[in-house]
Amino acid sequence: MGMQCPICETQSHVFYCAHCINSSPDLLIRLKFDLYILGKINNALRNKVDQYLEEVDDELNTNIRNGEQLESNIGVQILKERLGKVQVLRKERQNNKIKHKISQQDRRIKEKSRYIAELRSLINGPPKNQNRFTDPQTILKAQKQLQDKLEIAKRLSIQTRSEKLAMLNKWYSIRKRDSHDIPFTISYQPVISLKNFNRLPLPLIEGSLRKLIQYMNLLEHIYCIKYPSAMFVHEDEMLSLQGHSAKLKRNAPELLQVLIKLIQMILVVMTRSKLIDERKQNIDYAWILDQYDIDGLFYHMAMSIPIDTKSGAKNIQWSTDRLVDIVCSSLGAEKEEVLLKDHKKLEPPTDKKYEVSDRWYIVG
């Protein structure tokens, strides 16, 4: 199939479709022979070019430095010129890379030298704003501004803490009652004290201690303080003591330890919140417990009311054992027998029964 010019009808290219090539053996065989001949010619030319390249490489490596002439072969001469240009371009490229790296290093060295010179001038020379640091009025003004900011932050912190403490007291319903036996309550349960400790039933003591420990653990976050590990009481410890009277009697030493830790927590919070005057030396904590008792200290702490203090003997070292001795002497019992003695029960009506696991609440 011939393709001709539509104007002059001159044949410019011969085109065979795929159908004609596949269906005509004459065309297929002839084209295959042409392809085979072209492959042979290409292989011969490729081999010749490879030979020229080898000759040029050998001549360039051996004779070009001595100025000897290459063979009078036009192909060799052309390849020699082309390869020479290629080598020159490669060397120029390598030289340009080296120059670029040198310029980068030179620029970095200059920047570091300038930075070092600036630092030396700052160290050895006078300060830029010398009057700012030597003028007494400027210093006093800056101090006054910092003190004002600190005072504002302090007032905001105290106000926020007071609001949180008021919400906590409202949540736990801390009340003061006109009663000599049970003057203070928390969540409608009596606040335990040394004077009513022997007169309350064990379930009521356990319930009061649980509420007080819950309150003190929440108070730790409000005042942003951390109780010592030996002083901290987890709520699970109180739940493990909940149960029948026999179980409470077996766990009497644990209840005593919780009572001692409660007193320590109250004293720590009152000291951190400056409700106890720290300026006095050798504070007599036995006198404080005698005057305020546990319930009084707890109420003053919850309402942020300062308490009076008294200095004691200088040679007394206050510790947990010393506090245990004070509590035991106030209760009139030995350490191991504080909770094992018979407690006077709050007698209910005679026609009704009650269990030791019942919850007791103060009404009115």
From Swiss-Prot:
Disruption phenotype: leads to seven- to eightfold decrease of the renal fungal load and four-fold lower fungal burden in the brain of infected mice. Does not affect protein trafficking. Residues 5-20 are annotated as: Cysteine repeats. Required for cytoplasm to vacuole transport (Cvt) and autophagy as a part of the autophagy-specific VPS34 PI3-kinase complex I. This complex is essential to recruit the ATG8-phosphatidylinositol conjugate and the ATG12-ATG5 conjugate to the pre-autophagosomal structure. ATG14 mediates the specific binding of the VPS34 PI3-kinase complex I to the preautophagosomal structure (PAS). Required for survival and/or proliferation in kidneys and in brain. Coiled-Coils at the N-terminal half are essential for interaction with VPS30 and VPS34 and autophagy. InterPro entries: Autophagy-related_protein_14, UV_resistance/autophagy_Atg14. It is a peripheral membrane protein. It comes from Candida glabrata (strain ATCC 2001 / BCRC 20586 / JCM 3761 / NBRC 0622 / NRRL Y-65 / CBS 138) (Yeast). Belongs to the ATG14 family. Its main location: membrane. GO terms for biological process: cellular response to potassium ion starvation; cytoplasm to vacuole targeting by the Cvt pathway; pexophagy; piecemeal microautophagy of the nucleus. It holds the Pfam family ATG14. Component of the autophagy-specific VPS34 PI3-kinase complex I composed of VPS15, VPS30, VPS34, ATG14 and ATG38. Interacts directly with ATG38. This is Autophagy-related protein 14. Residues 38-114 form a coiled coil. One of its GO terms (cellular component) is phosphatidylinositol 3-kinase complex, class III, type I.
